[in-house]
Amino acid sequence: MSAKDKKLGEVVRELRERQGLTQPQLAERAQLALSYITLLESGQQVNLSPSAIGRLARALGITSKQLSEIGA
């Protein structure tokens, strides 16, 4: 696991928890598989397509650009 994967996962978890969302709720809002959210938050390397970045960002209340910069 790379440092950027871990950082992205930590930020996603923090944003999700601030909004009082569970992983299943975030997965549903972002229209992503729960396993994808779980892997992401645990710092595993996942391939974020532009579409997935957009859906995840909207579900977390941030822009796609902000989310992309976290994972850069």
Model-flagged regions — what are they?
Residues 66-72:
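Short amphipathic recognition helices of helix-turn-helix/homeodomain-type DNA-binding modules
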